[in-house]
Amino acid sequence: MTHILVVDNHGQFTHLEHRLLRDMDGVTVDLTDNTTPPADIDADGLVLSGGPTMADIGHCREYLTLDVPILGVCLGHQLIADELGGRIEAGDYGGYADVTVSISDADDPLVGSLAPDTRVWASHADEVVAVPDGFTITAESDICGVEAMGDTDRDLYGVQWHPEVAHTEEGEAVFENFVAICE
């Protein structure tokens, strides 16, 4: 069994990330608060959930030093970029949106299977505008230039959209692909 730990950054959809992973075959999943000490983290992979603000991310920056694959969703995606030398800024489009995302790297282990494009649900005010060294932009849209990014050498991935919500057409595939990375 692959054990995934969902780190709660107090986002509105965190429970959906947990539920989606819980319902997958071959996966055990736990939900933990972002104040859990890094030394207490024991998992095959981490999902850094979305959340309202970078001011309340607990130990998430420290989790990036753990030797496990990590998937950042929305705020989690942004904090990976911010901590590792990328840049985030206020986006031109804030709020909720049904967005068509173009997959720019069909070989990417996280989002490549969604190529050439997919419809997703976005809910964010800030966005990644420059990826850290070692990362590749793997998806983009008309409203956000870095919808997804990945560093396959370090198994660090991020998506700006919310794959856990029903409005995202192939969201479950993102989590299935992440579990495969963690195996």
UniProtKB/Swiss-Prot annotation:
Reaction(s) the record says it catalyses: XMP + L-glutamine + ATP + H2O = GMP + L-glutamate + AMP + diphosphate + 2 H(+)
EC annotation from Swiss-Prot or TrEMBL: 6.3.5.2
SUPFAM superfamilies: Class I glutamine amidotransferase-like (SSF52317)
A Pfam family of this chain: GATase
Single Gene Ontology MF annotation: ATP binding
UniProt-listed InterPro entries: Class_I_gatase-like, GATASE, GMP_synth_GATase, GMP_synthase_A
Annotated Glutamine amidotransferase type-1 domain residues: 3-183
Active-site annotation: C74 (nucleophile), H162, E164
Key words of the record: ATP-binding, Glutamine amidotransferase, GMP biosynthesis, Ligase, Nucleotide-binding, Purine biosynthesis
Pathway this chain belongs to: Purine metabolism; GMP biosynthesis; GMP from XMP (L-Gln route): step 1/1
Function: Catalyzes the synthesis of GMP from XMP.
Oligomer and partners: Heterodimer composed of a glutamine amidotransferase subunit (A) and a GMP-binding subunit (B).
HAMAP family from the UniProt entry: GMP_synthase_A (MF_01510)
Name used for this protein in its record: GMP synthase [glutamine-hydrolyzing] subunit A
